[in-house]
């Protein structure tokens, strides 16, 4: 009885730590939009950068074909929507727009 209890405690710790380390090493195999590459607008006007983002509701880019009129190429971009406040904010909601040249169009 004196050896059984410490042995059980050692096995419990080994089981706990091995399962927690395996869970932390495991990579997600697919959630909503993981690893999707999309085009996002940076804070500077006119600059567009590629970045990886996690998807969520509304994260699918719109079909921009025929949305920019005769202007080509018409591409979907993520842009911050700035409220009409005088003081700049640190966070702006984002929305999809269709961009051709320097013009943005509603999708």
Swiss-Prot record:
Signal sequence annotation: 1-22
Family statement: Belongs to the plant cysteine rich small secretory peptide family. Epidermal patterning factor subfamily.
Q: Which gene is this protein's source?
A: EPFL5
The record's section on InterPro entries has: EPFL
Q: What are the protein's UniProt keywords?
A: Developmental protein, Disulfide bond, Secreted, Signal
Task: Report what the protein is called.
Answer: EPIDERMAL PATTERNING FACTOR-like protein 5
Where is it mainly found? secreted
Tell me if Signal is a UniProt keyword of this record.
Answer: yes
Give a Gene Ontology cellular component term annotated to this protein. extracellular region
* A matching Pfam family: EPF
Subunit and interaction comment: Interacts with ERECTA.
UniProt note on tissues of expression: Expressed asymetically in the hypocotyl, on the side proximal to the folded cotyledons at germination. Detected in developing flowers, the chalazal region of ovules and near the root apex, but not in inflorescence stems. Expressed in cotyledons, flowers, adult leaves and fruits.
A single GO BP: stomatal complex development
**Where is it localised?**
Secreted
PANTHER family on file:
EPIDERMAL PATTERNING FACTOR-LIKE PROTEIN 4 (PTHR33109), EPIDERMAL PATTERNING FACTOR-LIKE PROTEIN 4-RELATED (PTHR33109:SF55)
């Amino acid at each position: 009885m004196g050896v059984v209890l410490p042995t059980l405690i050692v096995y419990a710790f080994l089981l706990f730590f091995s399962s927690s380390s395996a869970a932390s090493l495991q990579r997600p195999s697919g959630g909503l939009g993981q690893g999707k590459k999309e085009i996002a607008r940076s804070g500077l006007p006119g600059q567009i950068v590629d970045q990886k983002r996690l998807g969520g509701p509304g994260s699918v880019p719109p079909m921009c074909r025929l949305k920019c009129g005769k202007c080509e190429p018409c591409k979907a971009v993520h842009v911050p929507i700035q409220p009409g406040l005088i003081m700049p904010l640190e966070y702006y909601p984002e929305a999809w727009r269709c961009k051709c040249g320097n013009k943005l169009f509603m999708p």
